UniProtKB/Swiss-Prot annotation:
Pathway: Pyrimidine metabolism; dTTP biosynthesis. This is Thymidylate synthase. The keyword Methyltransferase applies. It comes from Shewanella loihica (strain ATCC BAA-1088 / PV-4). The gene is thyA. DUMP binds at residues 22, 180-183, 191, 221-223. Transmembrane segments: none annotated. The lineage of its organism: Bacteria, Pseudomonadati, Pseudomonadota, Gammaproteobacteria, Alteromonadales.
Length: 283
């Protein structure tokens, strides 16, 4: 929690004003932020200086791991995060690759589970990683990448958190996650939860102990209309201790994740928080 607040302070003190063409708003920006999460100690990085939500983040992650390409499937899991991008993005609505209502195209999990090969067929990156790690194998290339520039035109959105690199040292599994851009007041809580949960889940189904997860953000920013609430409200609050994340121990394989797992299989305990803050969202 303290590293989150330290990043917010750094952006305010050191950030450079950048005009964002997509949103038409200015944002204070810093380049390169490194966060780490102690998954072994189960210090779940849920923001405590405002009421924050975690279920949608894990539900979205589960949809990625299943390779979903339809917003309706994400809604069934409990994540509404793809509704607007799938159905309200004018460029995507007019894209000939869009298959209809709720279609997201070849984004995120599709790339992770079915990366198209130039000579035909697909690569299931996640399956390869799980198979290797389950055998105790780390080939120094246990990488799950959603970033495929050759197919950006076939999806509604480029990935922000785009690459996850797993590493095995003895019986302890580590994760390095890479993110190109982050709206820190709104988006980082979501991203932190996903990085932490991804390492927890993969360690559990491959039979390893989780170590630390390392989260690199390239472009970390706060929008101009978010600054007053960040400076005058959130940064003046004292953080509470981190809560804990529990995952159903019966989840033991990728097939379990693909078939029967729901949000009822995850629980957060010990979550103390301040009141919610309604930060402006930039579309």
């Amino acid at each position: 929690m303290k590293q989150y607040l330290a990043l917010c302070e750094r952006i305010i003190n050191e950030g450079v004003w950048v005009e964002n063409e997509r949103t038409g708003k200015r944002c204070l920006t810093v380049i390169n932020a490194d966060l780490e999460y102690d998954v072994a100690a189960n210090e779940f990085p849920l923001i405590t200086t405002r009421k924050s939500f975690w279920k949608g983040a894990i539900a979205e992650l589960l949809g990625y791991l299943r390779g979903y390409d339809n917003a309706a499937d994400f809604r069934k899991l409990g994540a509404k995060t793809w509704d607007a991008n799938a159905n309200e993005n004018s460029a995507w609505l007019n894209n000939p690759h869009r298959k209809g209502h709720d279609d997201m195209g070849r984004v995120y999990g599709v790339q992770g589970r079915a990366w198209a090969k130039p000579d035909g067929g697909v690569v299931d990156q996640l399956r390869k990683i799980i198979d290797n790690l389950s055998k105790g194998v780390d080939d120094r290339g246990e990488i799950l990448s959603f970033y495929n520039p050759g197919e950006f035109h076939m999806g509604c959105l480029r990935p922000c958190m785009h690459t996850h690199n797993f590493s095995l040292l003895g019986d302890t599994l580590y994760l390095n996650s890479f993110q190109r851009s982050c709206d820190v007041p709104l988006g980082l809580n979501f991203n932190q939860v996903q990085v932490f949960a991804l390492l927890s889940i993969v360690a559990q189904i491959t039979g390893h102990k989780p170590g630390k997860a390392y989260h690199k953000i390239v472009n970390a920013h706060i929008y101009e209309d978010q600054l007053p609430l960040m400076q005058e409200v959130q940064l003046k609050r004292e953080p509470f201790p981190s809560p804990k994340l529990s995952i159903n121990p019966d989840i033991k394989s990728l097939e379990d994740l693909e078939t029967w797992v729901t949000m009822d299989d995850f629980e957060v305990t010990g979550y103390q928080h301040h009141e919610a803050i309604q930060y402006p969202f930039s579309v």
